[in-house]
Amino acid sequence: MNDALKTYSIGIGWFLLSLVSSSANDVMSKYLGTRLHSFEVAFFRFFFSSIVLLPFVVYYGKNTLKTSRPFVHILRGLLLFFGMTSWTYGLSIAPVTTATVISFSIPLFTLILAVFFLNENIIWQRWVVTIVGFVGLVITLKPHAEDFNPEMLYFVLAAISFAMLDIINKKFVVKESMISMLFYSAIVTAVVSIPAAANYWLTPTLFELALLFILGSSGSLILFLLLKAFSMVDATATAPYRYLELVISAIAAYFIFNEFPDKSTLHGAVIIIPATLFIIYSEKKAMSKKI
């Protein structure tokens, strides 16, 4: 194996580990959401996340937390609160694989928001593919089916919130340290969650607390794994592997919750995945032309 292939293989390996961690997050969130309210899950998740990040703040020094954009951090925290509580609630009522497929639609929402907030010019082919992708999203949600649950729309609210976070990150991440972005987001989200969590409070068991701690730590772990992956391979090279998360989620959901993806979820995935892949590669092509 030559050095280039070895580096590529290791980079993809790091990326696959991030997918496993992401799927594990959904599984833990679903399990916790069966008893604890999503507000309480969000509170503990980001409370523990801020605790885990404290040693890094101490190590890199207080200057790491200096920011000239406190309102941006507050906005990110609010979006994280809406996104994560909606996502956790959605997981409590829907299969994990459905959530995974809907998460693939986030780039579609990001593309639309980029037009309004980043003044990006979008070629007509990407608009067509985006519309096709949303058709896949509608198929996954099954709004006209007799067994349609309107609460599934919480996933859509979460996807929009995460897309807005992507827009903010694109605009400000180069102007803020990674530690400050993570720490302030965790603190703000935890604080915002307190009133809502208190209203639906159920004292977690020791096992639930352990899962909540792992959930709070995993956000930083996923970021670490992604940074390791992207230090070895181009982000675009990892795009096709992103959709292996559906396989990982399906296996985990089957053995833990006895869930199996229904036809609508699979049909939606067949449409959404090519659409988002086209958007990712066309964005890469557009960026290379600018360079």
Curated annotation (Swiss-Prot):
TM stretches of this protein: 4-24, 41-61, 74-91, 98-118, 121-141, 148-168, 178-198, 206-226, 237-257, 260-280
InterPro entries per UniProt: EamA_dom
Biological process annotations from GO: amino acid transport
Organism superkingdom: Bacteria
UniProt key word Ubl conjugation: no
Ranges of residues in domain EamA: 21-141, 160-280
Cellular component GO terms held in the UniProt record: plasma membrane
Topological category with respect to the lipid bilayer: Multi-pass membrane protein
Keyword field: Amino-acid transport, Cell inner membrane, Cell membrane, Membrane, Repeat, Transmembrane, Transmembrane helix, Transport
Keyword Cell membrane included in the entry's annotation: yes
Any matching Pfam family: EamA
Compartments, record wording: Cell inner membrane
Function: Transports S-adenosylmethionine.
Family affiliation: Belongs to the drug/metabolite transporter (DMT) superfamily. 10 TMS drug/metabolite exporter (DME) (TC 2.A.7.3) family.
Stated name of the protein: S-adenosylmethionine uptake transporter
Organism: Rickettsia bellii (strain RML369-C)
Organismal lineage: Bacteria, Pseudomonadati, Pseudomonadota, Alphaproteobacteria, Rickettsiales
